[in-house]
Curated annotation (Swiss-Prot):
UniProt organism field: Geobacter sulfurreducens (strain ATCC 51573 / DSM 12127 / PCA)
Binding site for substrate: 15, 37, 64-73, 126, 187, 196, 216-217
Encoding gene, per UniProt annotation: pyrF
Classification via InterPro entries: Aldolase_TIM, OMPdecase, OMPdecase_AS, OMPdecase_bac, OMPdeCOase_dom, RibuloseP-bd_barrel
One Gene Ontology cellular component annotation held by this UniProt entry: cytosol
Protein name stated in the entry: Orotidine 5'-phosphate decarboxylase
Pathway it works in: Pyrimidine metabolism; UMP biosynthesis via de novo pathway; UMP from orotate: step 2/2
Active site positions, chain numbering: K66
Keywords noted in UniProt: Decarboxylase, Lyase, Pyrimidine biosynthesis
GO molecular function: orotidine-5'-phosphate decarboxylase activity
Enzyme Commission (EC) number: 4.1.1.23
SUPFAM superfamilies with a match to the protein in the record: Ribulose-phoshate binding barrel (SSF51366)
Quaternary structure and partners: Homodimer.
Length: 239
């Protein structure tokens, strides 16, 4: 794997609500990561201008808003996300088949088969455990729910999923090699686990078949963020 190929796999999570931070990170990391993740906090605070700022510096965007509502509302919100020119955005697979299928239908109609944002379905959050699921009435094991939701998403026409790296082999077996897998459960050897339970190192996640790796605090909290990003690329390349 080349360094450019490794770089394309890394998505830096912008864990901030300050617009000035967006410009700083876009300038600092645009040549060291493949994409920037804009989540709920940042997008709520700063809006679409966040996406445009990243694009101004040549960066690609993963809009991580995890849409989950009635089908028409999610489809219309998804159109607005795609019109911003983001590369990836997501919704919750727990919203069901109709919600996901209506979203894909709306996007295909809008973009008429041309290039558009890829839609990802969130399966089970990486902070969740089987006890967490039982507390909300889901008795199935985490792995079983992940595969069930990923399969449902693929059937609805969704482009891929967001899932823990430890579920990658199960998803690959159920959904095939062309189904995108984006994993936030990644921590390099030099970083603490924080609040995510089901994790792997970047090299392990890539070996397992992950297409994109979402990494935030191990880069953003490092004394030398650019250096931390380079260390992660080194680890991916070393395999």
């Amino acid at each position: 794997m080349t360094r450019d190929q490794a770089r394309e796999k890394v998505i830096f999570a912008l864990d901030s609500s300050e617009f000035a931070h967006v410009q700083y990170w876009a300038e600092t990391l645009s040549d060291r990561v493949g994409m920037f993740k804009v989540g709920k906090q940042l997008f709520t605070a700063c809006g679409p201008a966040t996406v445009r700022m990243i694009q101004k510096f040549g960066g690609e965007v993963f809009l991580d808003l995890k849409f989950h509502d009635i089908p028409n509302t999610v489809a219309m919100a998804s159109l607005e996300a795609a019109r911003l020119g983001v590369k990836l955005f997501n919704l919750h697979a727990l919203g069901g088949y109709e919600m996901m299928a209506r979203t894909v239908e709306a996007l295909d109609k809008e973009f008429k088969g041309g290039e558009r944002a890829k839609v990802l379905a969130v399966t089970i959050l990486t902070s969740s455990t089987e006890e967490t699921l039982r507390q909300v009435g889901i008795e199935s094991p985490v792995e079983e729910m992940v595969v069930r939701l990923a399969t449902l998403a693929r059937k609805a026409g969704i482009d891929g999923v967001v899932a823990s790296p430890r579920e990658i082999p199960l998803i690959r077996e159920a959904c095939g090699p062309d189904f995108l897998i984006v994993t936030p459960g990644v921590r390099p050897a030099f970083a603490a686990l924080n609040d995510q339970k089901r994790v792997m190192t970047p090299a392990e996640a890539v070996r397992a078949g992950g297409d994109y790796l979402v990494i935030g605090r191990p880069i953003g909290d490092a004394p030398d963020p650019a250096g931390a990003a380079e260390m992660i690329l080194d680890e991916i390349m070393a395999g």
